[in-house]
Amino acid sequence: MGYSYSEKKRIRKDFGKRPQVLNVPYLLTIQLDSFDKFIQKDPEGQQGLEAAFRSVFPIVSNNGYTELQYVDYRLEEPEFDVRECQIRGSTYAAGLRVKLRLVSYDKESSSRAVKDIKENEVYMGEIPLMTDNGTFVINGTERVIVSQLHRSPGVFFDSDKGKTHSSGKVLYNARIIPYRGSWLDFEFDPKDNLFARIDRRRKLPATIILRALGYTTEEILNLFFDKITFEIAGDKLLMTLVPERLRGETASFDIEANGKVYVERGRRITARHIKALEKDNISQVVVPSEYILGKVASKDYVDLESGEIICPANGEISLETLAKLAQAGYTTIETLFTNDLDYGPYISETLRVDPTYDKTSALYEIYRMMRPGEPPTPESSEALFNNLFFSAERYDLSTVGRMKFNRSLAFPEGEGAGILSNEDIIAVMRKLIDIRNGRGEVDDIDHLGNRRIRSVGEMAENQFRIGLVRVERAVKERLSLGDLDAITPQDLINPKPISAAVKEFFGSSQLSQFMDQNNPLSEVTHKRRISALGPGGLTRERAGFEVRDVHNTHYGRLCPIETPEGPNIGLINSLSAFARTNDYGFLETPYRKVVDGQVTEEIEYLSVIDEANYIIAQANSNLDENNRFTDAFVTARGERGESGLYKPEDIHYMDVSTQQVVSVAAALIPFLEHDDANRALMGANMQRQAVPTLRADKPLVGTGMEKPIALDSGVAVVAKRGGTVQYVDASRIVIKVNEDETIAGEAGIDIYNLIKYTRSNQNTCINQIPCVNLGDPINRGEVLADGPSTDLGELALGQNIRVAFMPWNGYNFEDSMLVSERVVQQDRFTTIHIQELSCVARDTKLGAEEITADIPNVGESALSKLDESGIVYVGAEVKGGDILVGKVTPKGETQLTPEEKLLRAIFGEKASDVKDSSLRVPNGTSGTVIDVQVFTRDGVEKDKRALEIEEMQLREAKKDLTEELEILEAGLFARVRNLLISSGADAAQLDKVDRTKWLEQTIADEEKQNQLEQLAEQYEELRKEFEHKLEVKRKKIIKGDDLAPGVLKVVKVYLAVKRQIQPGDKMAGRHGNKGVISKINPVEDMPYDENGQPVEIVLNPLGVPSRMNIGQILETHLGLAAKGIGDQINAMLKQKQEVEKLRSYIQKAYDLLGNGSQKVDLSTFTDEEVLRLAGNLRKGLPVATPVFDGADEAEIKELLKLGGLPTSGQITLYDGRTGEKFERPVTVGYMYMLKLNHLVDDKMHARSTGSYSLVTQQPLGGKAQFGGQRFGEMEVWALEAYGAAYTLQEMLTVKSDDVNGRTKMYKNIVSGNQHMEPGTPESFNVIMKEIRSLGLNIELDEE
């Protein structure tokens, strides 16, 4: 493959053996596509806002003479862009305008003639918009809406697995779950009666539902049972014989016909007997009259003369009724066919416990169950039942639910509506009875075919619909009130309920989460997270093991590795690398189609439901050059997800990639296949906590997944169109777009403004650094600037560190690690953290708070860093306790006399009646002020500092826009110049004239003249647009801010804190090998090799075997080899060897074991490109070892050889303190280490005087409350064990909650008296009060 200019800068050697058939799809699709569907107009009205509007409108008044119809909607442009919203703390949203039509009909006219139509555009609140990176900015913070995995609507058959009843009998149940509406359950009880529940309420016999649907007893029995027909012929009783029904029964009489005995009495009827009966075509047999006794009649038998019912439907037949039937002239009797084996009498038994007898009584019974205490009437009970399952407004199965329903009950696809029909309910009961009879299987709830994904768009739509329904009620009321002549649609609609519903969802739903912005990976994985929690989902407490477990349908859809440790394990999952959702919301994964043992290039996405019928081979199956399987038997997954061996011709599909199974975070772990799953889980989770270091360093040993994640995360700047770099500085990159990618008549210039030193949600620093140079050719989609934790467009979460696995004086006992001072000196793990501190000036009852430098009782030195407005300077270095913003609050104890008030007003002396409430730097923090923002309420006068900031912003905006205009103009005039020169103008002459005059030239060629006129128009457009943009920007900057009620001013101060690595910081590798730094050791004391090169971190070898994460050792070896090759290249560069030698050596490194898919041909590179590549490889040759398809031991050894290193990967080391050789070679290599966001600075804390808990009077706990350390039970036991009685007494009294003792002791210390008098601890009083509250009097006997 050819490499572009940018790609040639650094090429990662790929160890993958299998070609990449399908690139990793865009990683944020699940968020962006879902929201697009929500916002885009859908002509069919199946989804999004359109569907919500169509489901609620038209709203018809109660009398039916007026209706409010929906026409269409549009979204306005948002007022502020994303960046401005973040700074101002506002929501990035667009106003929703809906066109509505109010139609009123003529009451007098019989043909519903239209009397009046009013059309109007109505404002319906704001809809938050998604940014390009799949996030929402709500109140200035970036949030992510996590997708939810919930139970798909449809019908589910399940059993209690014998857990409900003490006998251990398995009780089966069926549940119809709609998308919205009431749930309908059917269940068996231990006596095998069938019951129904609506919305999980009290259970009713299931036949009540059937009666309510209008079925009679006879019809119900016809629906569920086969019949046996008996004939009365004289004194004989003949039975119509269906031989198959007799199988397995014991004959209670001789079965004979035509004089031949087929089965003797007492014998078991077998298949042989049945064959004989069928062969001789026996259709009737004589049965003794006792045989019919106890059988159940299938219909009412009525004495036609007297009208008396001899035997009712579902009544048992006795000798008496038999005689009566014969007497009444019945010759045939139909009874129900049941047996104990596979035709149970469940419905018949249920009818016997059913208290109802017709439709009305059944409806009454349902009404009483749903609305206990209300008297039912025929109308209300009928309406209630219809509204439950048969009203499209109240009940909707949705297309997904209907599809699942039809598949489950083997109905034809695409039939049926969103509501239930009688046939649906009967089919569910039939299938449930079949399952009870031993035919059919129960469903597996954890199967991904029964769980679907609900993404942002769908959840937002549901919330929006809830808001609309609230509005609908109000509109209906309003329409019924009459006087419609004066009303417009505008008056009818109150947007409050809609915006409240939407706001609540985006602001405080359980699934709307504060984005994890530690690093690019944590952003991407947060957006790809799938949660089973949340509204309509599971709760942590109720979720059992089965739901949390890995299911075989997760393969290629949900990652089996990445899930949190702790209470949420298995409930929060991550999407696999290639997975996507289909239209129904089920997860799909791609496969290559296989035809007759030949693997094609065709790729198909299959959902679990589709996949069930196919045999699918693994991605690492061996193929020959014609893509045919080479093995006689191939390992593949067959039915039910079980793996087995299959012939190549039986295989239907093959996996796309070895990385298909895991999520992107797990796919970043090299040699994942050699790690234990539990440790891999920790590794995947800890990469998300890595803090971006000062200088990003790409991993030497990667997996090839680093590039797609960095590009898709949106932290790096990616070229929208190809071109050439025309200008580059720290904050802006300008690209002159290629001719073939420009739209006709535009300037062809793309400008990218970079983000500089801004704060992330996790207080880490976001900063973009250009990685292109002037004149570089750029292709579309290539990286122009690196963001945090990216290096040349590759994800770089940590640093490559030289590690040795050996014990070192106990400093790496139990997962601690010894770090060399050199790591600190080189700032390898130095990170920048940005804190935002804000000060709010409010309008209080006693007067307004004021931001000022005039603070009572504060010395000059404390104010030295403030300006005259009382706000700290940018660039000031501050430490804990320093004032950042001076603020005074009015105190209101003293009532002033009018004379005093006058004097105060004249002399302005007010120091006495205000208290200092300034914003100070929190304890333990120090840093540099990097930015100050002042927000002032509309109508409040801006202070000097605010005006300065405003002026600066205006200047910068004007400068930016002017530069932008200049760049665009230059591009435009270059085109004009070319046009004129091509038309015969003289270049030297042109350059003497003012550029604007060029546009006034005339050209003989008409086509070129048109082009020139077009360019002149564009020039005008540019100027106009510039003026417009500048005006808009000016208005935004000058405009007062929209602050919360009662707030006059907000000042935000941003502090940058530089944190070097220190003992107590937590670090980790990528294999779940985490530890804490125990000591920073001087370089000269670290172990070193023969060349005098010291190691940088010493790790404990005992941390490897028991944890079974061997991947870290392989990574260390491969890292050593990669670095060795880099050292060789570095040596060649230093010796200034000729380029050819360099080229052949690098070529050798890339070609080594070149049986993989990667082909690098350096002969096509120019000398300059080879040198640039070598320069980037001197720190080590980056390698990729894809998950499950990576480098093996032999390949690592070959690479070590090429780097001139021992193939064992072990090196002799010397002790840095004594210079002695260690007694055996040590594993040394390069491991990629991450610094995690668990820094000791944030955790270290010591309490001095602080606040106490109100009730117990004990110090609070935790750093945030400036709390103390709890002296708990175990600590008390320790003191008791030592008999340290006085120490214990102090601990329990004066040092804790003896209030009087505390104060006395303080006074004593002040006066130099070292005594203490312990009193009663407050918690003792508390327990006394608690016991009294139980009604037991307890008093302290003070004798």
Swiss-Prot record:
GO terms for cellular component: DNA-directed RNA polymerase complex. Transmembrane segments: none annotated. It is an enzyme of class 2 (transferase). CDD domains: RNA_pol_B_RPB2. One of its GO terms (molecular function) is ribonucleoside binding. The keyword Disulfide bond does not apply. Pfam families: RNA_pol_Rpb2_1, RNA_pol_Rpb2_2, RNA_pol_Rpb2_3, RNA_pol_Rpb2_45, RNA_pol_Rpb2_6, RNA_pol_Rpb2_7. GO terms for biological process: DNA-templated transcription. Its EC number is 2.7.7.6. Belongs to the RNA polymerase beta chain family. DNA-dependent RNA polymerase catalyzes the transcription of DNA into RNA using the four ribonucleoside triphosphates as substrates. This is DNA-directed RNA polymerase subunit beta. It comes from Haemophilus influenzae (strain 86-028NP). The lineage of its organism: Bacteria, Pseudomonadati, Pseudomonadota, Gammaproteobacteria, Pasteurellales.
